[in-house]
Amino acid sequence: MRRVLVLAASLVLLACIGARPVEAQASTTRGFNVGIHFTGSTLKIEDGDNNNAGGGGLWFGYGFNRTVQLFLQFDGTQFDVNDAAVEGDWTMGHADLGVRFHFANSLRSWVPYLQVATTARVVSVQNGVVNDVAQADDVSLVGAGITLGGGILFYFNESFAADLQLAWTGGKFTRIEAGSVSYNDLNLDAQSARFNVGVSWWP
């Protein structure tokens, strides 16, 4: 009887030891992922000064495995620009389609990452002034660029994490629109940076 009890206790102990890695899993990066965040942004056009902005954004992703994730990210910010080709009250939007690379370990509750994306960048300007002439219509600048970024996820549990992200976008504004008038040969260098603080969830 004693041998049976010892054997049973040993089997229970082995089962507990075998189950520990599953129970200890602290993070996941696989499957569908959604997130929301606050955004702090800067924008610099040509040789002008940096202009600061605030706003928020949304994140949608799908992790094919522990490392590689395809994502779509939208960020919107609002700020004033006083020394650019178009002055006024600016609202800027970024739409990123890209790939994120996680340096993941499922037993660790923090996961750093790097990402790269192609970005559409659109600016709408209210109360616009072009060459010292006030515009009756809103003015829009449209362009594209490449975004490089990185960040770190801090997991509260296996599927819910705080997300800290820094992204930099370089590119050009190539089209300007004012009402029904459009000019497609614009060539304005523009750099923008975003610092995002939010949460991310794997349902």
Stretch-by-stretch model annotation:
Residues 1-29:
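Cleavable N-terminal export/targeting peptides
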Residues 29, 38-40, 59-146, 154-158, ...:
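Gram-negative (and chloroplast) outer-membrane scaffold detector with strong preference
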Residues 33-59:
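N-terminal targeting signals for Sec/Tat export/insertion, comprising classic cleavable signal peptides
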Residues 48, 84, 126-128, 174-178:
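Outer-membrane beta-barrel and related beta-rich outer-membrane complex signature
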Residues 129-136, 177-185:
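Solvent-exposed, glycine/polar-rich loop segments of beta-barrel outer-membrane systems
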Residues 166-167:
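Internal, hydrophobic beta-strand segments that form the core of beta-sheet-rich folds
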Residues 171:
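Short, solvent-exposed beta-strand-terminating loops
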